[in-house]
Amino acid sequence: MLKKNKDELNDLEYLVTQENGTEPPFQNEYWNHFEKGIYVDKLSGKPLFTSEEKFESDCGWPSFSKALSDDEVVELVDKSFGMVRTEVRSEDSNSHLGHVFNDGPAETGGLRYCINSAAVQFIPYDKLEELGYGDLIPHFKDQGEK
């Protein structure tokens, strides 16, 4: 499992995960990334989302219809910037991940988890076993295909 210490985070990763910041839309690593695999918490290495639930939302950030497990994310009321939103944090590391909105695809439950790329790390499908995430292979529709 991949893990990082807080002192290993770059400035943007620290701003996003520890200070509840937001990276620029359309200028982040995973907003337009659709390779098969999983997205893990940058600090704890815990799996949070899969490419199976990722969709194009035109918002400029990675968007997912659901989390891999409700046990790995925490949803909190966020009243910052004069808005009322639902913040998403990692359960294990208490890192800010992004927000969840009710404007996602209806056929997948209507949620859009809008996640900062700086808060997660992508693990390609073909590296899951090697990096200790082999138990997640059954979460993919076409197991064995890359």
Curated annotation (Swiss-Prot):
Domain MsrB: 2-125
Family statement drawn from the similarity comment of this UniProt entry: Belongs to the MsrB Met sulfoxide reductase family.
Enzyme Commission number(s) of this protein: 1.8.4.12
InterPro entries assigned to the protein according to its UniProt record, in alphabetical order: Met_Sox_Rdtase_MsrB, Met_Sox_Rdtase_MsrB_dom, Mss4-like_sf
Organism: Staphylococcus carnosus (strain TM300)
Alphabetized UniProt keyword annotations: Oxidoreductase
One of the protein's GO biological processes: protein repair
Official protein name in the record: Peptide methionine sulfoxide reductase MsrB
Active site as annotated: 114
Catalytic activity: L-methionyl-[protein] + [thioredoxin]-disulfide + H2O = L-methionyl-(R)-S-oxide-[protein] + [thioredoxin]-dithiol
Domain of life: Bacteria
Pfam family, one: SelR
GO molecular-function term, one example from the UniProt record: peptide-methionine (R)-S-oxide reductase activity
